[in-house]
Design a protein with these regions (language model features):
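A C-terminal junction/extension of Radical SAM enzymes
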Residues: 165-191
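Conserved AdoMet/S-adenosylmethionine-binding subsite of the radical SAM
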Residues: 1-143, 149-150
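A broadly tuned preference for mixed-charge, low-complexity surface segments
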Residues: 66, 94-98, 114, 154-162, ...
Length: 191
């Protein structure tokens, strides 16, 4: 009753939901039988068979993109984005609505060059794809610093993230809109 009254739903997120596709499908099917809206959030770094299996039973896929440039992606995430982009390209051919989520991280992916590369990539991948629902830009925060400190560990991103500056989220948003790409800049923070 709560979900019908609130208009809410359930989002499966991570870790990485695509690492447990059979369980995720069962949960999603049960929720949908109850009339509850479902979404999955994924980084897309999973076998296509898992992405396809889970995505086809969800009402919405929230797909994380961090960087367009593969070399930078490997540097900052430890993995190539080739699989992620191939999965996204295939996902956009399914009938499931897809929203791209981009954490805007100062000094990592908010330069004019990287913003333009990301938006060009998105334009090319999503052209003519009716499943594409737009972009959610998520400003980065450093809340994790405190958690690492409590554990007596160094925060791995402390040497990477540009300190003392706001991200260029508003610039990213304006460039996306100028290119005709539906985008929002979240007031919620990620990190």
């Amino acid at each position: 009753a709560y979900y019908q009254l609130s208009g809410g739903g359930v989002t499966l997120s991570g870790g990485e939901v695509m690492l447990q596709p059979d369980f995720a499908v069962q949960v999603l099917q049960n929720l949908r039988r109850e009339g509850i809206h479902t979404a999955v959030e994924t980084a897309g770094f999973a076998p296509w068979s898992a992405v396809e299996k889970v995505s086809t039973v969800a009402d919405l896929v929230l797909y994380d993109l961090k960087l367009a440039d593969d070399t930078l992606h490997q540097r900052f995430t430890g993995v190539s984005n080739i699989r992620i982009l191939r999965n996204l390209e295939k996902l956009l051919t399914l009938n499931t609505p897809v929203r791209l989520r981009i954490p805007v991280i100062p000094g990592v992916n908010d330069s004019s060059h990287e913003i333009n590369n990301m938006l060009l990539l998105i334009s090319n991948l999503t052209a003519g794809k009716t499943s594409f629902q737009g972009i959610d830009l998520l400003p980065y925060h450093a809340y994790g610093v405190q958690k690492y400190s409590l554990l007596g560990r160094d925060y791995p991103a402390s040497t990477i993230i540009r300190k003392g500056t706001e991200s260029n989220g508003a610039t990213f948003l304006q460039i996306a809109k100028d290119r005709g790409i539906s985008a929002t800049l979240s007031t919620s923070l990620v990190g």
